[in-house]
């Protein structure tokens, strides 16, 4: 698993959130993953977070999901759930300690889903990555393609947005991404029809070309990577990009 920037493991005080009696409530590997890498975003879709016992309490009164005899929990039991993650689309991943269930609370669907995981023998920080991949398959009905990477929330991340204006002598954004790869071979490349992200350890971040918008380029970097950032920024400006204020 590629780690985008230096992880921020949980402090001793934060680790105390996971009492020995409660550790079995969480999905396999979750506690070790958090203790090793801290909070962050997994493969661009799941925000892995510390347990939150309060965020779902108001949802027990909102009537967002339908409940019947096949529902894994009742509407009042939503308030008892512990959120451990959110997707970039606003879905919740949570555990319900009293019934020992892992639950998916979707933002754009009417039913809460119980996630049934396959048993696994290993128990390390890589285990939870496999669990998240399995959750993705169950929820979306397909496997997530591409490489496995994790973006820790360091609290020291900076960013710059640029625009590649259209013009006869200008490369397309797709061409610019290819030129960047050739000039600065990345440590990792994640690309699809909508976006291309080139990851660099020197940046502690990545350069993202937004194919969907056709003009947007963004550089995400750690504050102590100023020299590497300056080189990338100067190159992008030399190719016709403009800073977005």
Tell me the role of every PLM-derived stretch.
Residues 1-96, 136-245:
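A surface-exposed partner-binding patch
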Residues 103-142:
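Compact, glycine/acidic-enriched structural inserts
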């Amino acid at each position: 698993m590629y780690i985008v920037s230096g992880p921020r493991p949980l402090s001793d005080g934060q680790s105390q959130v996971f009492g020995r009696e409660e550790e079995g409530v969480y999905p396999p590997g979750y506690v070790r993953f958090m203790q090793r890498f801290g909070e962050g975003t997994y493969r661009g879709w799941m925000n892995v977070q510390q347990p939150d016992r309060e965020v779902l309490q108001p949802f027990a009164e909102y009537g967002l999901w339908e409940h019947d005899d096949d529902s894994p929990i009742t509407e009042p039991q939503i308030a008892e759930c512990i959120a451990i993650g959110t997707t970039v689309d606003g879905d919740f991943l949570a555990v319900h300690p009293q019934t020992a269930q892992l639950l998916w609370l979707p933002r754009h669907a009417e039913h809460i889903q119980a996630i049934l995981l396959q048993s696994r023998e290993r128990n390390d920080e890589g285990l939870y990555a496999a669990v998240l991949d399995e959750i993705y398959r169950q929820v979306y009905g397909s496997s997530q393609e591409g490489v496995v990477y994790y973006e820790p929330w360091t609290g020291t991340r900076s960013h710059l947005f640029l625009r590649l204006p259209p013009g006869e002598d200008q490369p397309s954004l797709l061409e610019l991404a290819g030129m960047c790869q050739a000039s600065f071979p990345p440590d990792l490349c994640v690309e699809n029809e909508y976006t291309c992200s080139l990851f660099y350890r020197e940046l502690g971040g990545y350069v993202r070309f937004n194919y969907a918008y056709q003009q947007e380029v963004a550089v995400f970097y750690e504050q102590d990577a100023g020299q590497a950032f300056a080189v990338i920024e100067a190159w992008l400006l030399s190719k016709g990009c403009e800073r977005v204020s």
